[in-house]
């Protein structure tokens, strides 16, 4: 019989009365993702999502790779289905996993029988299949404590399923069950990771990027768009809002004390982001801020920059070490793009001696020569909305 994927649910199984809502959203997300790889049937039974190719044209390998990036799944098994007959099960194990056993020094059997109508117990299935495999592969010894390879047999209601060790899923909750949020996306390492981490909790993520042409180049903008595209491999398509920020930065440079440049810039970014977010149905902002990492990310600095917004600000990286953030960036594939040497607006007009312990009063005084509302409205008129999908052509 053909290959099939068994995708095991994560914390969804712990949900109560609204569990069905989470399951339906997960199934919907998987169906949408599989469309790019051919015709697949997606159905859910016994806390497992079954993904079954419906014709020979389906891209099995591409679909399998994509399943690893779908939030809500804790483990994935690539299986061969067969009839619920002990001889057919053995033949399928031999055909599907025999080469793997020949490459291993030791193995063990693990069986699970959820269909109690099957005449053999789980232990008896393991004994029967394991005994035959030991005879057929004399160089691969049985070791139930620390095996080099494990053969799994699951006898379920529809069929028996044979597979090797499961692979880890993306975890988290299905995209779309946790509302919508707007991520302030720069070209650095942190903000793409922050977007990924909040998306992992079931949140649909949009992004806003502040573009300061001609102080920043088209390459810098393309870099940010590519980071957004890479994140969509996990969270699905997203909208990126590009905001023209040049006039605001020039106004800050010309009218404000230098030590407050970055903080005032951040306050404008937060307020503009909130207005775009509320217009797009987002209930929170997301930033890649990390306590103490730079001068604008002290506790006092974050207090004054966050004071201009009313909606929650999610900061998933706030207590992480930089190396932890880098590890996640490498895992999700954004690191190589983040380190490309194209500066963004955060590096424009950087003060030599930034204020690290500002107060709200100091910021209000520093901004007194700015027409905040006029500058914000002018920036909002420049917003360009771009929809990004993972299967788009790379931007750089």
Map each language-model feature to its residues.
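Conserved G/P- and acidic residue-centered "switch" motifs that form tight phosphate/ATP-binding loops
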Residues: 188
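RNA-binding accessory domains that recognize and position tRNA/RNA substrates
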Residues: 1-182, 192-238, 307, 355-360, ...
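Small/polar glycine-rich anion-binding or flexible loop at a beta-alpha turn
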Residues: 293, 341-349
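Structural beta-sheet core signal
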Residues: 183, 207-209, 242, 287, ...
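A conserved beta-strand->alpha-helix junction
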Residues: 228-255, 342-344
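Active-site adenylate/phosphate-handling loop in enzymes that bind or generate adenylated species
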Residues: 128-133, 166-178, 249-332, 378-395
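A short alpha-helix-loop-beta-strand transition element characteristic
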Residues: 333-341
